[in-house]
């Protein structure tokens, strides 16, 4: 059976509080899933909706991952914060990729560290 998953990648340089980080990750998970193909979304749901949260050092890393994911045909969602609490308005916080086949996502995120 083919495994499906979703990855959410956070920026380590922002040093967000746990609560703020949880909200940003949730935004990315929902938004990226909305862009996924119907078949990827259904397969992911049937497989338990696996999610993996990873990290990068800085904003440029998120942009590079988004471009790599686009080239692989993966759905993505780059999340920008409204700036009402901890960080400046318009700050890009996280990137959601997938859901999609795990082997496709691993081509893009396989070298990243877990949060």
UniProtKB/Swiss-Prot annotation:
Pfam families reported for this sequence: PTH2
Main location per the UniProt record: cytoplasm
Catalysed reactions, as listed in the record: an N-acyl-L-alpha-aminoacyl-tRNA + H2O = an N-acyl-L-amino acid + a tRNA + H(+)
Protein localization: Cytoplasm
Record keywords: Cytoplasm, Hydrolase
Keyword rRNA processing: no
GO molecular function: peptidyl-tRNA hydrolase activity
Biological-process GO terms, alphabetical: translation
CDD domains attached to this UniProt entry: PTH2
EC number of the protein: 3.1.1.29
GO cellular component: cytosol
Family: Belongs to the PTH2 family.
Function: The natural substrate for this enzyme may be peptidyl-tRNAs which drop off the ribosome during protein synthesis.
UniProt-recorded name of the protein: Peptidyl-tRNA hydrolase
Species the sequence originates in: Methanococcoides burtonii (strain DSM 6242 / NBRC 107633 / OCM 468 / ACE-M)
